[in-house]
A protein has these predicted regions:
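Short beta-strand element of the alpha/beta-hydrolase
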Residues: 78-80, 86-98, 102-110, 208
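Catalytic-loop region of hydrolases
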Residues: 13-85, 447
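Acidic catalytic loop of the alpha/beta-hydrolase fold
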Residues: 328-333, 364
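Accessory cap/linker subdomain of secreted extracellular hydrolases
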Residues: 211-315
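Primarily recognizes the serine-hydrolase "nucleophile elbow" in alpha/beta-hydrolase
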Residues: 161-232
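Alpha/beta-hydrolase active-site loop
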Residues: 119-123, 146-169
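C-terminal catalytic histidine-bearing segment of alpha/beta-hydrolase fold enzymes
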Residues: 299, 303, 339-447
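Short beta-strand/loop motif that positions the catalytic acidic residue
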Residues: 318, 322-330
Length: 447
């Protein structure tokens, strides 16, 4: 989910007709016969603005795969910084969290509006600073299939292939590869890790780092219904309909006028507007569809949602090392679901370092507290340093100061809000064994 939920990326209306939107832009259309090309094949390219000083950016249209197995094409933006060596490549999955192609990262780069995203510039800059080249894919695909993890994972893996295939990027064919994503971006990264051994076994992947992971779409939908994050539920369901014909057909049968209008509206805007439009909405009621609170138990719905649950299939166990981080009191993405996926992978032989943030930073704060540590961990893997053997569960407190273990990154991210009274209150609750609320709940203390 887009953890900077107060940012609205709906820029199409502001830009007007001067720049074509992806649906009307010929650059996004693959050539005739593209279906026979191998996944990761590059069809066209164009330069764009990176929004970062000294960083060059080029967009490539490449072949990838839809959830139904058919061929499609999507766009990725390749970033090369002054420190990029050509020996390391990281796929960055931004938290798009929407079902509108104007919300895709490629459109932000093309229109020069990357500053409208709170994460795109800082995250990619941090990765570029390690000497890696970064590829930022529109992993949802041309149908904006938000929350359809398998399709997103294939889109990310094919972006790595495309970057390697694009010779002007200057990447070594033996470059060390990795991926990073948080929240909605962790759907794509987690599924890329799961599918890589079978879908893209030739890729030289050295590690994956992701956090705030919606490992179970069903539990995530249930968690945000009726809350200030309810917009994610509606856009997530709309994304399932965009990916699965069966889901769209079933919703057409059971939707009310209000439900159809909500899905239609979600398809015209980005995550910030979704959160505003659907504040406190509960899609699991008869206001939106005739099944009411039985919606997620409907066989057609269960089928597609189960297909998006990480860790259920032993054959999809990641083989490259993983760094997962999640806030114990994440108010958006259920902690237990992410932990369950990690445990399942570990039981099947994966190497996972699962970091639990117990300091009460919540969904947003955990990203700020541990994102830098995750990127540092990933850089160690790409640099050839092996992780500690096997799986480990690491606890973190002090508002994001991680406890150390062999093989962990040396960087320490310290996150705080500067008020000793707030810190003391959090420590008091923690010591008493009580839940520590997210930082936003303390807003009244500092306003």
């Amino acid at each position: 989910m887009h953890y900077y939920f107060f940012i609205c990326l709906f820029i199409g209306a502001v830009l007007g007709a001067a720049v074509p939107i992806p649906d009307n832009d010929p650059f996004y259309k693959p050539p005739a016969g593209f279906e026979s090309a191998a996944p990761g094949t590059v069809f066209s390219n164009r330069p764009v603005s990176s929004g970062l000083s000294g960083v060059t950016a080029v967009q490539v249209l490449y072949r990838t795969t839809l959830i139904n197995g058919s061929a499609t094409a999507t766009v990725a933006t390749i970033l090369t910084g002054p420190q990029s060596t050509g020996t390391k490549l990281v796929a960055y999955a931004g938290p798009e969290d929407s079902v509108n192609t104007t919300c895709a990262d490629s459109y932000l780069y093309y229109t020069g509006t990357t500053s409208s995203s709170s994460t795109l510039g800082p995250d990619t800059a941090a990765i570029l600073a390690t000497g890696a080249t970064v590829v930022v894919p529109d992993y949802e695909g041309p149908n904006s299939a938000f929350s359809v993890g398998r399709q997103e994972g294939m889109g990310l893996l094919d972006a790595l292939r495309a970057a390697l295939n694009y010779a002007p990027a200057g990447l070594s064919k033996t470059a060390a590869l990795g991926g990073y994503g948080y929240s909605g971006g962790a759907i794509a990264t987690g599924w890329a890790a799961s599918l890589q051994p079978t879908y893209a076994p030739e890729l030289n992947v050295k590690g994956w780092a992701f956090g705030g992971t919606p490992a179970n779409v069903t539990s995530t939908l249930q968690n945000v219904e009726g809350t200030i994050f309810a917009g994610y539920a509606i856009s997530g369901l709309a994304g399932q309909m965009a990916g699965y014909t069966a889901a769209q057909e079933r919703f057409t049968q059971i939707s009310t006028a209000a439900g159809a209008a909500a899905i239609a509206k979600a398809r015209t805007q980005c995550s910030g507007s979704d959160l505003t439009s659907f504040l406190l909405a509960n899609f699991e009621t008869t206001k939106y569809q005739t099944l009411g609170n039985r919606l997620l138990y409907d066989p057609a719905v269960v089928s597609v949602l189960l297909n998006g649950t990480m860790g259920l299939n032993k054959a999809e166990t990641p083989t490259a090392p993983i760094y997962m981080f999640h806030g114990k009191y994440d108010e958006v993405i259920p902690y237990a679901s992410a932990q369950a996926a990690a445990n399942a992978w570990c039981a099947n032989g994966a190497s996972v370092e699962f970091v639990t943030e117990t300091g009460g930073t919540g969904h947003l704060g955990t990203a700020l507290a541990l994102g830098g540590t995750a990127i540092a961990w990933l850089d160690l893997r790409l640099g050839g340093t092996p992780p500690a053997a096997g799986c480990a569960h690491v606890s973190v407190f002090k508002l994001g100061i991680p406890l150390k273990r062999a093989g962990s990154a040396t960087a320490i991210e310290i996150f705080g809000i500067g008020d000793v009274n707030i810190v003391a209150d959090m420590e008091r609750l923690h010591a008493a064994g009580k839940p520590v609320p997210g930082l936003f709940s303390y807003a009244k203390w500092v306003l």
